Amino acid sequence: MRLILLSSLLLLGIFLANGHEEDPDGKVLNSLIDSLMHLQREFANLKDAFLTVHRARSFGSGSERLYVTNKEIKNFEALRQICEQAEGHIPSPQLENQNKAFANVLERHGKEAYLVVGDSANFTNWAAGEPNKAAGTCVKADTHGSWHSASCDDNRLVVCEFYFIL
């Protein structure tokens, strides 16, 4: 949609730069302006529809972040690539409600998944006796949302985190 808006602006700029000899009544210019205004309205409508869906999904999970699985089972490196390709992130719950939303996905699928824990995390949900570096350098969440040290080579449910800043 932004590409269309930019293209319309480019056409309008080219038209204005070349003068008005071929459009003495301004019909072409007015048509371009009308088209641009229509595209702006369509873009605003699309943005509103997107935000409505996002708010509805966020309301249901209690989290502004969305945790989505493609149901594949992969190791940590494959997860990183998949989430990056999807323009998402490896889950990194920063609040209890985010961890609950993440755990809900795991519980529905009956699988564990990887997550990353930030250095300055204010929220953690380590299981008793964790973290345990002997178990591995990665972190997995169980179906209850408890965190455990884990090997990065094990295959787990692919879950990516998406969040929107508008």
Swiss-Prot record:
The keyword S-adenosyl-L-methionine does not apply. Glycans are attached at N122. Disulfide bonds join C83-C160, C138-C152. The lineage of its organism: Eukaryota, Metazoa, Chordata, Craniata, Vertebrata. Keywords: Calcium, Disulfide bond, Glycoprotein, Lectin, Phospholipase A2 inhibitor, Secreted, Signal. One of its GO terms (cellular component) is extracellular region. Residues 1-19 form the signal peptide. It is found in: Secreted. Its main location: secreted. This phospholipase A2 inhibitor binds directly phospholipase A2 in the presence or absence of calcium. The keyword Calcium applies. It comes from the Eukaryota. Homotrimer; non-covalently linked. Expressed by the liver. Belongs to the alpha-type phospholipase A2 inhibitor family. It holds the Pfam family Lectin_C. Residues 46-161 form the C-type lectin domain. This is Phospholipase A2 inhibitor clone 04. GO terms for molecular function: carbohydrate binding; phospholipase A2 inhibitor activity.
